[in-house]
């Protein structure tokens, strides 16, 4: 019997992206410079037109401009930046327009394939546009015809970035300033999926023809050892097999290896593209049916249906000489091939909990 989903007394809270935080703090700092007014909260307009008020931790003058900071509130989303101080330092001068700089804790792009050129601060296009729109409006309101130099920072961002995919993507020195809507939707996993897409794009842009999409550290280690692939070719897909397969329709590579634990691969084989236990479960009767197709006896089929886990089912099949790992990989391969272009050579690998291969198909 499945565990019951715990009840929550209230709906999950939405939060705000680092891009929204950067917009609010840069606007507050610029307003202080142009009007002398130091706000303790600031209203911004999100990309879809919503107006939100964001609290500030500080807004103050500095020797060469002004700075403002806010605490990132990701709502009920388990975001790595939740609770971090996001700040902006703004200086006036130069030609009209906004020039962006990476402050402490914000990374710099060092590889091709991302939405920004090499050498640029890792402040994504939508947050840049949000800041530019607000600062241009402020300049027009105040009759200011010069430019803005905006430096965005994240307190502790360099350490936080080690918990993200930024180092593998070639974003060094800190975090990225992200967001397309300005809002963090709880458990939407949009940032994780975006990092999967970026990983594929970076690999392609750097001439990598063979990528390996892996569910976790053990499968990454297995692929690295098996093929000698560099880190740039290893895509940490987690539970999001569909994010990899669907992105390859738009951005194909020559060869894709997918590797995961036997249980995860059995979910993909059954047609599930989100392998998390919240969204898909292991189908033991289906495993028994596939074992039958591979020659399993009635007794083995019954034992698989009654197994406590997929690992037990695999062990039972192996003891009877039934290659259930290969069978599962073959079904997973069919699912993948129905999604990716025919030009992509696909192969599947299943591993056990010790990282040993227990099945493959190509």
UniProtKB/Swiss-Prot annotation:
Membrane-spanning segments: none
Pfam families named in the record: CbiD
Biochemical pathway: Cofactor biosynthesis; adenosylcobalamin biosynthesis; cob(II)yrinate a,c-diamide from sirohydrochlorin (anaerobic route): step 6/10
Domain of life: Bacteria
Reactions listed under catalytic activity: Co-precorrin-5B + S-adenosyl-L-methionine = Co-precorrin-6A + S-adenosyl-L-homocysteine
Enzyme class, UniProt record, top EC level: transferase
GO MF: cobalt-precorrin-5B C1-methyltransferase activity
InterPro entries listed in its UniProt record: CbiD, CbiD_sf
Enzyme Commission number(s): 2.1.1.195
Signal peptide extent: none
Sequence similarity: Belongs to the CbiD family.
Classification via HAMAP family: CbiD
Name the record gives this protein: Cobalt-precorrin-5B C(1)-methyltransferase
Source organism: Burkholderia multivorans (strain ATCC 17616 / 249)
Protein encoded by which gene: cbiD
């Amino acid at each position: 019997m499945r565990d019951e989903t715990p009840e929550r007394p209230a709906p999950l809270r939405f939060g705000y992206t680092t891009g929204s935080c950067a917009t609010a703090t840069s606007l507050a700092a610029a307003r202080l410079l142009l009007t002398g007014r130091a706000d303790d909260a600031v209203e911004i307009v999100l990309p879809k037109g919503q107006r939100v008020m964001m609290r500030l931790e500080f807004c103050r003058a500095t020797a060469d401009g002004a700075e403002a900071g806010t605490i990132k509130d990701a709502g009920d989303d388990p975001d790595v930046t939740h609770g971090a101080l996001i700040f902006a330092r703004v200086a006036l001068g130069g030609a009209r327009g906004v020039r962006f700089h990476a402050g402490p804790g914000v990374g710099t792009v060092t590889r091709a394939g991302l939405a920004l050129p090499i050498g640029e601060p890792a402040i994504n296009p939508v947050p840049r546009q949000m800041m530019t729109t607000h600062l241009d409006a402020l300049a027009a309101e105040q009759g200011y015809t010069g430019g803005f130099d905006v430096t965005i920072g994240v307190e502790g961002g360099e350490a936080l970035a080690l918990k993200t995919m930024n180092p593998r993507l070639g974003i060094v020195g800190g975090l990225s300033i992200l967001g397309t809507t300005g809002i963090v939707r709880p458990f939407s996993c949009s940032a994780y999926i975006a990092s999967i897409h970026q990983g594929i794009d970076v690999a392609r842009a750097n001439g990598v023809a063979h990528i390996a999409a892996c569910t976790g550290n053990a499968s990454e280690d297995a692929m690295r050892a098996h093929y000698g692939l560099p880190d740039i070719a290893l895509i940490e897909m987690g539970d999001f097999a569909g994010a990899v397969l669907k992105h390859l329709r738009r951005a194909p590579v020559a060869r894709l290896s997918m590797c995961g634990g036997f249980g995860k691969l059995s979910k993909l084989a059954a047609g599930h593209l989100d392998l998390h236990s919240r969204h898909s479960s292991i189908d033991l009767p289906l495993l028994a049916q596939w074992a039958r197709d591979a020659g399993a006896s009635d007794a083995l089929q019954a034992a698989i249906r009654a197994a406590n886990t997929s690992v037990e089912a695999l062990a039972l099949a192996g003891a009877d000489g039934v290659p259930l790992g290969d069978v599962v990989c073959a079904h997973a391969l069919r699912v993948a091939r129905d999604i990716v272009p025919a030009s992509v050579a696909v192969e599947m690998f299943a591993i056990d909990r010790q990282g040993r291969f227990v099945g493959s198909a190509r």
